[in-house]
């Protein structure tokens, strides 16, 4: 039965927003419009992943979590810690906005895209993932979707865990959350992860010297947070985390030159906030600072040698957001300010550079009878390209009880990164990349099956491409993306099923050729059940045909990469109420495949872990 009520009573529509690991319709999400609202009131397709899901899947990386979600296509240059890209609904990797606790991820290397192979899985307590345009709420990058990684724990207690696996993988983690009196709580975490890895064998991409070494990964992480409730309505927090990573990879070798095949990444982030949570009005002020230093060097000479490269960026942000309950919905408004500072040499930028952006936005949500309306508008003032406006609107109609039709349209954009603007081949006159998106969807609850099917189109213009003749970047590319997405979840006795299907036709609108590294079709299936206190899980993923470039010879040739079916098997057993042991086999049938041409994947891998809570 569908309940209709205002946001004052936290309305929920049980049949809607089907595909989510946390399937409760009353689940609150914060990413859609920056304040908590029931997931069922978000018209855009939204997925929520909890820490319990991550533990059940026994994921050892953020990429392993995201690859299971609808519309997501992950490519990686090998195994743990190797360079990776996220494609959502066929858009570029730079068209995905990644937030950490609602704050934009600091992008070392000013590449303009997030490499989540470096972000520690130990910090991830929850993931909220929204598909479709969201620039009208968040500004640049939110063309394909938004991934918000939340580090705040929900429950107090202490957990000690350890794990071991293939390729000499080992992981040790301890975390605790404790109450200090009635109004204060503190959270601490420390994590160590290491793997010897394997030889990713970047065939043809390493120049004249073969590199038959293991490409390992090491990560050390610290996290701390202090939260305090001043009154029932006022609260504040201070939070900080940092990680120190080292990655070995196969680099391009030129005779007589150092071999830069080691990456060292230092990253730290700090934020503090003050929140007011009244019955009708909510407000929050958050400030943050992050600093990343990304070295690539030859270990024979060290990271401070003149042959090494350093990408260094500092990011400062201030967010002021407000939300007011109005009728059967709400109105929100806020201001974002951001400053990014680079050092000379970062991203091949000869001089250090500051870029500032101020955004003002307005959001609205209202329920009128059988209809739900959502809209947002934003204007950004950027120190490089000036002003840019975006907007989006959606409407949902419950035409039969338990069934809803949704139509939406939105504009979004991607600002040029600093390397494209001021690098050796840069062009300071670049404009933002622009997107116009349409989507129509049906969703409902039929015979216990919670389902959604949608079709979408995304036209992207002013794409920034490199011109081989002028050796400069220009706004000259166009893309046309059409897709269909279907999701469902249901129970059959003790079995829980979650399934999704994606069809994406992503093409260069000028040449009508497929965009590289995007699978045309994907099928994802998760089966979970409990038998004699054992928790079992089977994951299936089909990756369809994709295209890539062979960079081993010039001119570069386009190559076709066939599809593959992958299976994972995971099991967990609670030895006591405090101690749980887990085991997993990834790539159960040891399939040989690549997501980036020339870079091998790991093959079959085993992990064994245990956790003790008190």
Curated annotation (Swiss-Prot):
Ca(2+) 2 binds at residues 213, 215, 249-250, 261. Residues 1-20 form the signal peptide. Cyanocob(III)alamin binds at residues 83, 85, 92, 110-111, 251, 309, 517, 551. One of its GO terms (cellular component) is pore complex. GO terms for molecular function: ABC-type vitamin B12 transporter activity; metal ion binding; porin activity. The chain crosses the membrane at residues 158-165, 169-178, 184-195, 217-227, 232-248, 263-277, 279-296, 309-325, 328-337, 353-369, 371-381, 385-400, 403-417, 434-443, 449-458, 473-490, 494-509, 517-529, 535-550, 558-572, 585-596, 602-614. Residues 155-614 form the TBDR beta-barrel domain. Residues 38-152 form the TBDR plug domain. It comes from the Bacteria. Keywords: Calcium, Cell outer membrane, Ion transport, Membrane, Metal-binding, Porin, Signal, TonB box, Transmembrane, Transmembrane beta strand, Transport. Coiled coil: none annotated. InterPro entries: B12_transptr_BtuB, Plug_dom, Plug_dom_sf, TonB-dep_rcpt-like, TonB-dep_rcpt_b-brl, TonB_box_CS, TonB_rcpt_b-brl_sf, TonB_rcpt_CS. HAMAP family: BtuB. Belongs to the TonB-dependent receptor family. BtuB (TC 1.B.14.3.1) subfamily. This is Vitamin B12 transporter BtuB. It comes from Escherichia coli O139:H28 (strain E24377A / ETEC). The gene is btuB.
């Amino acid at each position: 039965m569908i309940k209709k009520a205002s946001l004052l009573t936290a309305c929920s529509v049980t049949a809607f927003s089907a595909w989510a690991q946390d399937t409760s319709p009353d689940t609150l999400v914060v990413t859609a419009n920056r304040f908590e609202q029931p997931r069922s009131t978000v018209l855009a397709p939204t997925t929520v992943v909890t820490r319990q899901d991550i533990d059940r899947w026994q994921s050892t990386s953020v990429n392993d979590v995201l690859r299971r979600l609808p519309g997501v296509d992950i490519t990686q240059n090998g195994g743990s810690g190797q360079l990776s890209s996220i494609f959502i609904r066929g858009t570029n990797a730079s068209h995905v906005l990644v937030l950490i606790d609602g704050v934009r991820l600091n992008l070392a290397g000013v590449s303009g895209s997030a490499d989540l192979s470096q972000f520690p899985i130990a910090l991830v307590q929850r993931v909220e993932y929204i598909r479709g345009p969201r620039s009208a709420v968040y500004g640049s990058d939110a063309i394909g979707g938004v991934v918000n990684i939340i580090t705040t724990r929900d429950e107090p207690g202490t957990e000690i865990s350890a794990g071991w696996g293939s390729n000499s993988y080992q992981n040790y983690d301890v975390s605790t959350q404790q109450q200090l009196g009635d109004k204060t709580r503190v959270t601490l975490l420390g994590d160590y992860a290491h793997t010897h890895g394997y030889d990713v064998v970047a065939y043809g991409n390493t120049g004249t010297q073969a590199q038959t070494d293991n490409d390992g990964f090491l990560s050390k992480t610290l996290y701390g947070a202090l939260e305090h409730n001043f009154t029932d309505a006022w609260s504040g927090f201070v939070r900080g985390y940092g990680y120190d990573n080292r990655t070995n990879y196969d680099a391009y070798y030129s005779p007589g030159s150092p071999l830069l095949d080691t990456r060292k990444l230092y990253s730290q982030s700090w934020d503090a906030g003050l929140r007011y949570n009244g019955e009708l009005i909510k407000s929050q002020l958050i400030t943050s600072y992050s600093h990343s230093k990304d070295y690539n060097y030859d270990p024979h000479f060290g990271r401070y040698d003149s042959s090494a490269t350093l990408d260094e960026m500092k990011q400062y942000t201030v967010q002021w957001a407000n939300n007011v309950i109005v009728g059967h919905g709400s109105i929100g408004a806020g201001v974002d300010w951001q400053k990014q500072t680079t050092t000379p040499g970062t991203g091949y930028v000869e001089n250090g550079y500051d870029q500032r952006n101020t955004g003002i936005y307005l959001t609205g949500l209202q329920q009128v009878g059988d209809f739900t309306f959502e809209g947002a508008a934003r204007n950004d003032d950027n120190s490089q390209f000036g002003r840019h406006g975006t907007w989006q609107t959606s409407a949902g109609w419950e035409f039969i009880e338990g069934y809803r039709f949704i139509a939406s349209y939105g504009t979004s954009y991607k600002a040029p990164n600093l390397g494209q603007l001021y690098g050796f081949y840069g062009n300071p006159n670049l404009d933002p990349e622009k997107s116009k998106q349409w989507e129509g969807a049906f969703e409902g609850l039929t015979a216990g099956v919670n389902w959604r099917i949608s079709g979408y189109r995304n036209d992207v213009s002013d794409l920034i491409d490199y011109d081989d003749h002028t050796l400069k970047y220009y706004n000259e590319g166009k893309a046309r993306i059409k897709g269909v997405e279907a999701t469902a979840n249901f129970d059959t006795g003790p079995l829980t099923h979650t399934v999704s299907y994606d069809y994406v036709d992503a093409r260069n609108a000028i040449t009508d050729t497929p965009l590289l590294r995007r699978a045309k079709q994907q099928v994802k299936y998760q089966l979970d059940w409990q038998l004699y206190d054992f928790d079992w899980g089977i994951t299936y993923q089909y990756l369809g045909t994709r295209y890539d470039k062979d960079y081993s010879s010039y001119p570069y040739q386009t190559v076709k990469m066939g599809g593959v079916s992958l299976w994972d098997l995971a099991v967990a057993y609670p030895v006591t109420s405090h101690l749980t042991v887990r085991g997993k086999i990834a790539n159960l049938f040891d399939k040989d495949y690549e997501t980036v041409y020339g870079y091998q994947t790991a093959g079959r891998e085993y992990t064994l872990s245990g956790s003790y809570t008190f």
